[in-house]
């Protein structure tokens, strides 16, 4: 069985974390040799950067600072976690990657998406996902889910208004148009179990 680099993307409240947990279980049961990781984070240094970027109280952070910090964390994640796993034949399942920067920092912060892309390509070089699952859910539904989930860890980006989250969604649509060959859109209004089964079936096809 070959190893591939898989990413989960979607707006806040799309259910990515829940689906990622279920996928972890189902992929293990299917006998897939893989690691599960996340961004921002995924390595000791990158997790420290995550705490800075998402920390409540850092609302004054400049948008370009945000882009550069996340790209730096991503670089460390790639060299310390993702590439080593792929090199020994392990599939990588990652909660968010470069596309999140294009949508959240690029579109969400009204920055030039091409510039954000170039910064990230410098950081990751040739380590691009083989398959990206976009969990598609309306912004208002996602924010309602966040509000209803009292046990969820709330970060700085969750506190942005709906206009910001609508910009993020529009940004994702642009990203999908940039890389249509690796994206699969998944209806995230369905149950986490249904979403997981849809994604797992495609993963097994990709690995065949």
From Swiss-Prot:
Keywords: ATP-binding, Kinase, Nucleotide biosynthesis, Nucleotide-binding, Transferase. GO terms for biological process: dTDP biosynthetic process; dTTP biosynthetic process; dUDP biosynthetic process. PANTHER family: THYMIDYLATE KINASE (PTHR10344), UMP-CMP KINASE 2, MITOCHONDRIAL (PTHR10344:SF4). It holds the Pfam family Thymidylate_kin. The gene is tmk. Its EC number is 2.7.4.9. CDD domains: TMPK. The keyword Kinase applies. This is Thymidylate kinase. GO terms for cellular component: cytosol. It comes from the Bacteria. It is an enzyme of class 2 (transferase). ATP binds at residues 10-17. It comes from Listeria monocytogenes serotype 4a (strain HCC23). It catalyses: dTMP + ATP = dTDP + ADP. Belongs to the thymidylate kinase family. InterPro entries: P-loop_NTPase, Thymidylate_kin-like_dom, Thymidylate_kin_CS, Thymidylate_kinase.
């Amino acid at each position: 069985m070959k190893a591939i680099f898989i990413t989960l993307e979607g707006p806040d409240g799309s259910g990515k974390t829940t689906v990622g947990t279920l996928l972890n279980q189902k992929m293990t049961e299917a006998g897939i040799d893989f690691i599960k990781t996340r961004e921002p984070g995924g390595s000791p240094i990158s997790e420290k950067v995550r705490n800075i970027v998402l920390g409540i109280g850092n609302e004054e952070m400049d948008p370009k600072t945000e882009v550069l910090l996340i790209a730096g964390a991503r670089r460390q994640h790639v060299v310390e976690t993702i590439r080593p796993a792929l090199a020994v034949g392990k599939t990588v399942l990652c909660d968010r990657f470069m596309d999140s920067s294009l949508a959240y920092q690029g579109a969400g912060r009204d920055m030039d998406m091409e510039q954000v892309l170039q910064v990230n390509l410098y950081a990751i070089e040739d380590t691009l996902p083989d398959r990206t699952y976009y969990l598609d859910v309306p912004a208002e539904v996602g924010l309602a889910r966040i509000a209803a989930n009292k046990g969820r860890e709330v970060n700085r980006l969750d506190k942005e208004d709906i206009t910001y989250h609508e910009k993020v969604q529009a940004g994702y649509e642009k990203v999908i148009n940039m890389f249509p060959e690796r994206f699969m859109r998944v209806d995230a209004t369905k149950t986490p179990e249904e979403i997981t089964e849809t994604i797992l079936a495609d993963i097994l096809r990709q690995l065949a």
